[in-house]
UniProtKB/Swiss-Prot annotation:
<feature type="binding site">
    <location>
        <position position="285"/>
    </location>
    <ligand>
        <name>Mg(2+) 1</name>
    </ligand>
</feature>
<dbReference type="GO" id="GO:0006541">
    <property type="term" value="P:glutamine metabolic process"/>
</dbReference>
<feature type="binding site">
    <location>
        <position position="834"/>
    </location>
    <ligand>
        <name>Mn(2+) 4</name>
    </ligand>
</feature>
<dbReference type="InterPro" id="IPR011607">
    <property type="entry name" value="MGS-like_dom"/>
</dbReference>
<comment type="subunit">
    <text>Composed of two chains; the small (or glutamine) chain promotes the hydrolysis of glutamine to ammonia, which is used by the large (or ammonia) chain to synthesize carbamoyl phosphate. Tetramer of heterodimers (alpha,beta)4.</text>
</comment>
<feature type="region of interest" description="Carboxyphosphate synthetic domain">
    <location>
        <begin position="1"/>
        <end position="402"/>
    </location>
</feature>
<dbReference type="InterPro" id="IPR016185">
    <property type="entry name" value="PreATP-grasp_dom_sf"/>
</dbReference>
<comment type="pathway">
    <text>Amino-acid biosynthesis; L-arginine biosynthesis; carbamoyl phosphate from bicarbonate: step 1/1.</text>
</comment>
<feature type="binding site">
    <location>
        <position position="176"/>
    </location>
    <ligand>
        <name>ATP 1</name>
    </ligand>
</feature>
<keyword id="KW-0464">Manganese</keyword>
<keyword id="KW-0665">Pyrimidine biosynthesis</keyword>
<feature type="domain" description="ATP-grasp 2">
    <location>
        <begin position="671"/>
        <end position="863"/>
    </location>
</feature>
<dbReference type="InterPro" id="IPR006275">
    <property type="entry name" value="CarbamoylP_synth_lsu"/>
</dbReference>
<feature type="binding site">
    <location>
        <position position="834"/>
    </location>
    <ligand>
        <name>Mg(2+) 4</name>
    </ligand>
</feature>
<keyword id="KW-0460">Magnesium</keyword>
<comment type="similarity">
    <text>Belongs to the CarB family.</text>
</comment>
<feature type="binding site">
    <location>
        <position position="834"/>
    </location>
    <ligand>
        <name>ATP 2</name>
    </ligand>
</feature>
Length: 1029
């Protein structure tokens, strides 16, 4: 059936700030849906509080609301925009829960808005554990034995019946939040209590343990004609007990027989029909008992999910785009497959390669928390690799994670390695090293329950390592040898380690033997039809499937896996660069390994290489494509680290030169440059060794800010207040950071106000694009501080000085593109802290706040355009106050105190916009899920809060200065760092831990008291006159 014509305006709900369990995959799916629906002529309205996304760019939707994802704000948008329908299946759990709240409040009925994609009943059946179990029973699909309970009394009663271990799964939560596996009665009580609290409907499912079973997922799509297709099967390398988001996964499933696969397929078809997902995609998870083949369904997500993004990238089938079109009435057989152009979307994808996904973790950011993986997701990003075999795919995925830690494991004894066989991020490395040492597959299977087939495959890689030494001198290897070795996924660097040569020596010998990769195409049909979308991966075979063109080409390096400190903001910058260069007439080539992102969509760049971001893999592409330029400064630290090596090998790096990058990143040369320019710096020195650091600290005095060269996200950065603290810090930093980094010791400017300045420079002229004032004082990482643009608390004279000095610095360095500079203002003097001649994480926020696409301009500068040609010759004036606030993942890391410091810990951000800076701050807080109360009790702990107390009392809150028994307040402001902060966080009470944020919070509450908080689209804001600033 053709698309519905009774719908004119469709409201899409986004997913809000990036958080663990809900990351960049929803920017990718939302962006696809926006393009698809607008392409069909619908008016599309988007609400999403996350400015770091492509989907919230003003030209993607007809009206974009950077507003909190709360029922109150969305109702105001519905009243204003009068949508005919809401599509809630593309914004993760946040959007589904919000749709249900709007239904329950009567908002949908009041305004006559229809839910499309998934109806209320389907969402309830898919998400409510009790209803799901009943539905499965009805169609004869087995679920784990279990019971839904709504109180501790019920839970204790049922636990007696089912025993231990026991799985606790709260209803309607994200990424397994609040759940877990209890092995002891004490754990059972603690997890269940937390789960009941975290579930918005106060219910948890208690289930029999299926630890150690094999886990599979099927990605399923259905249309209103009841055509159901399977996009792909996905197998979890890690057995049951590890959240699928934290597990290594493989597509297609490797260890299922055809009969077993058909059984899961048939059950999936029955499940999606019974749940009632009439249109769109669902992800269905199964567990299979390896001993007897018993199959149970674990759960389904009646929406586009993290696995959908992986399945899309693994197969080339655009699940989110097709889901959006099915939601407006199309049938699968009416939609063409973009890649083949001859097959309809009702053809199930078929693939002739293997895809491996490996998650990326950030436990090093949260010392003291356990790295034991369970049913609560804790990874912050992921990589994907494609190979012709599992072995090739696994080795490529391992090197894509950028955590080259082979040496660490080689030095461990066997007892230490065996101690790492519990579910944790390092288990795969321990398994590999133990196999290297001769551990048996049976012993490893007993310890890990990782399927023997996977262990056999890894053992074959290890056997090949031994065989390499028997092939004779590497200089005499024939092409056939090289081909067989490389088809197992071995990198030049790893071959070099084994045979005792450098990576560059191996590369030269390999090229001399004419052993270079060919590039295959991801085509959805296992090469049965011609593919029109150039989406490629490398392997070592005969036939190359890349067809060249005569257009000048530019390679843009992506940012690899998301992590704390290098998130979706850098993907945003690389996508903008692609668009700008396409407009300028270049053929764009994207290289990236992250399946969650817009940059790795098959129709973003002219050509996509899904490859690891390593010197070897990137240089192979440069050799193959012969581009006129390679852009490294938009993808964060990952491509920057490759810049010098690529340039030395002949890659034409364009934009800011590797020499400039080095001059700004290397602390000693940067300090000398600032002295030459007469820029004030905190007193500081660079130490090359721990001994020198101790000596310099004694000269400078404490407190000091200590930071290593070449790090992102404040990695290993700390405020040290005594020699003892410094000694401990040095021991830790030399253990945690690769190589022997030089360390900058700076006088710490206690209580200074920090500024972030983003600048564009074309080599002849520099223009500051935006100056952000931090809410938090110096000492809190810039990525964890809220910030406001334009600044509120600084004089015009000081801002003019900062602007002029920043522009002088950019010109002196020879920046060609973007530069971010951080300043600290104390007693009327601005001190320069650091300069980064690259895109910073504030680029998307500033681009929206000042209505200028900074990353697009940086890309145009890289290919020779001037700021004058671009049309940016002076600092743009902001039409509104914009506040960026961060989302912090403390809840996922038990026992960690939610206190901010110089090491970055946030995973995402929200944006608030208003004509009043304090109302913009209030909106940003709500957008980051910190729901500041406008009434009730505020508990203030610590000195220096009298002004805050007075403001809150004036706003009508009851202010108390000590805790009333065990009763928690409605707002906790605690600058003493007490354990109450953690307790309040776990109970959902908004917390503030610094005096600076407390001042802003109190003023925001007072401002919100007397305001209607009207909603206004970003497009509308950007057309008005500038605010003062």
């Amino acid at each position: 059936m053709p698309k519905r014509t009774d719908l004119q305006t469709i409201l899409i709900l986004g997913s809000g700030p990036i958080q663990i369990g809900q990351a960049a995959e929803f920017d990718y799916s939302g962006t696809q849906a926006l393009k698809a629906l607008r392409g069909e002529g619908y008016r599309v309205v988007l609400v999403n509080s996350n400015p770091a996304t492509i989907m919230t760019d003003p030209d993607l939707a007809d009206a974009t609301y950077l507003e909190p994802l709360t029922p109150e704000f969305v109702e105001k948008i519905i009243a204003l925009e009068k949508p005919d329908a809401i599509l809630p299946t593309l914004g993760g759990q946040t959007a589904l829960n919000l749709a249900m709240e709007l239904h329950e409040r009567g908002t949908l009925e009041k305004y006559g808005v229809e839910l499309i994609g998934a109806g209320v009943e389907a969402i309830k059946k898919g998400e409510d554990r009790e209803l799901f179990q009943a539905a499965m029973k009805k169609i004869g699909v087995e679920t784990a034995r279990g019971k839904m309970v709504h109180s501790m009394e019920e839970a204790v009663e049922y636990q007696k019946e089912i025993g231990l271990p026991i799985v606790i799964r709260p209803s309607f939560t994200l990424g397994g939040t609040g759940g877990g596996i209890a092995h002891t009665y004490e754990e059972f009580l603690a997890i269940t209590e937390g789960g009941l609290r975290d579930s918005p409907v106060t219910s948890v499912l208690l289930e029999e343990s299926i630890l150690g079973w094999k886990e599979y997922e099927l990605e399923v799509m259905r249309d209103t004609a009841d055509t159901v297709i399977i996009i792909t099967s996905i197998e979890n390398f890690d057995p049951m007990g590890v959240h699928t988001g934290d597990s290594i996964t493989v597509a297609p499933a490797q260890t299922l027989s055809d009969v077993e696969y058909q059984r899961l397929r048939n059950q999936s078809l029955a499940i999606i029909r019974e749940i009632g997902v009439a249109t769109g995609g669902s992800n269905i998870q199964f567990a299979v008992n390896p001993d007897n083949g018993r199959v149970i369904v674990i759960e389904m997500n009646p929406r586009v999910s993290r696995s959908s993004a992986l399945a899309s990238k693994a197969t080339g089938f655009p699940i989110a785009k097709i889901a959006a079109l099915l939601a407006v009435g199309y049938h699968l057989d009416e939609l063409p497959n973009d890649i083949t152009r001859v097959t309809p979307a009702s053809f199930e994808p078929s693939i002739d390669y293997v895809v491996t996904k490996i998650p990326r973790f950030a436990f090093e950011k949260f010392p003291g928390t356990s790295d034991h993986l369970g049913t609560q997701m804790r990874s912050v990003g992921e990589v994907m690799a494609i190979g012709r075999t599992f072995k090739e795919s696994l080795q490529k995925a391992l090197r894509s994670t950028e955590s080259d830690i082979r040496g660490v494991y080689a030095e461990m004894d066997e007892a230490g390695l065996r101690a790492l066989l519990y579910p944790n991020p390092r288990r795969i490395e321990a398994v590999i090293e133990l196999l290297r040492r001769g551990e048996s597959i049976d012993a490893l299977f007993d310890a890990t329950k990782i399927d023997r087939w996977f262990l056999e495959q890894i053992k074959e890689i290890i056997d090949a390592e031994h065989e390499l030494l028997e092939l004779g001198p590497i200089s005499e290897w024939k092409y056939e040898y090289w081909r067989e070795v490389k088809r197992l996924g071995f990198s030049d660097a790893r071959i070099g380690e084994i045979v005792g040569l450098s990576e560059l020596q191996v590369r030269q010998l390999r090229k001399a033997a004419r052993a270079t990769p060919v590039y295959k195409t991801v085509d959805t049909c296992a090469a049965e039809f011609e593919a029109y979308t150039p989406y490629h991966y490398s392997t070592y075979e005969w036939e190359d499937e890349v067809t060249g063109t005569d257009k000048p080409k530019v390679v843009i390096l992506g940012s690899g896996p998301n992590r704390i400190g290098q998130g979706v903001e850098f993907d945003y910058a690389t996508v903008h660069a692609v668009w700008a260069l396409q407009e300028a007439g270049y053929e764009t080539i994207m290289v990236n390994s992250n399946p969650e992102t817009v940059s790795t969509d098959y129709d973003t760049a002219d050509r996509l290489y899904f490859e690891p971001l390593t010197f070897e893999d990137v240089m192979n592409i440069v050799d193959h494509e012969k581009p006129v330029g390679v852009i490294v400064q938009l993808g964060g630290q990952t491509p920057l680290k490759l810049a010098k090596k690529l340039a030395d090998a002949g890659a034409p790096i364009i934009g800011t030169s590797p020499e400039t990058i080095h001059e700004a990143e290397d602390r000693a040369s940067f300090n000398a440059l600032c002295e030459r320019l007469g820029l004030s710096q905190p007193r500081g020195k660079v130490a090359e060794t721990p001994e020198q650091a101790r000596q310099l600290a004694a000269e400078l005095g404490f407190p000091l800010m200590a930071r290593p060269s070449y790090v992102l996200g404040g990695r290993a950065m700390r405020t040290v207040r005594s020699m003892e603290e410094l000694v401990t810090y040095l021991d830790e930093v030399y253990a945690a950071v690769e190589g022997q980094p030089s360390i900058l010791l700076d006088q710490f400017l206690e209580g200074a106000l920090e500024l972030d300045v983003d600048t564009l420079c074309d080599g002849e002229r520099a223009v500051v694009a935006g100056i952000m004032e931090h809410v938090e004082a110096a000492g809190v990482h810039s990525g964890d501080s809220a910030c406001v643009l334009p600044p509120v608390n600084l004089s015009a004279e000081l801002l003019a000085r900062v602007k002029a000095d920043t522009e002088r610095l950019a010109l002196e360095l020879g920046v060609r593109g973007l530069m971010n500079v951080q300043w600290a203002v104390k007693d009327g003097t601005a001190y320069i802290l650091e300069a980064n001649p690259r895109a910073s994480r504030t680029v998307p926020f500033v681009s929206k706040a000042v209505n200028h696409p900074l990353a697009k301009s940086a890309a145009r500068i890289a290919v020779g355009h001037t700021l004058e040609q671009i049309g940016l010759t002076e600092t743009p004036e902001a039409a509104m106050y914009s506040v960026k606030e961060v989302h912090l993942p403390f809840l996922k890391f038990k026992g960690v105190s939610p206190i901010l410091g110089p090491e970055m810990k946030s995973t995402g951000e929200s944006m608030g916009i208003d004509a009043d800076p304090y109302l913009a701050f209030y909106r940003a807080q709500l957008g980051a899920k910190s729901y500041l109360p406008l009434s009730g009790t505020a508990l203030l702990l610590g000195d220096g809060l009298d002004e805050v107390a007075s403001t809150l009392q004036g706003a009508g809150l009851n202010v108390i200065r000590e805790q009333d028994g065990n009763t928690l307040p409605d707002l906790l402001i605690d600058v003493t760092g007490s354990p109450l902060l953690r307790t309040a966080l776990e109970r959902g009470v908004p917390i503030v831990s610094t005096r600076e944020a407390a001042v802003w919070t109190s003023k925001a509450i007072a401002a919100a008291q007397g305001s209607e908080l009207r909603v206004r689209s970003l497009q509308d804001w950007q057309t008005q006159e500038a605010v003062a600033g």
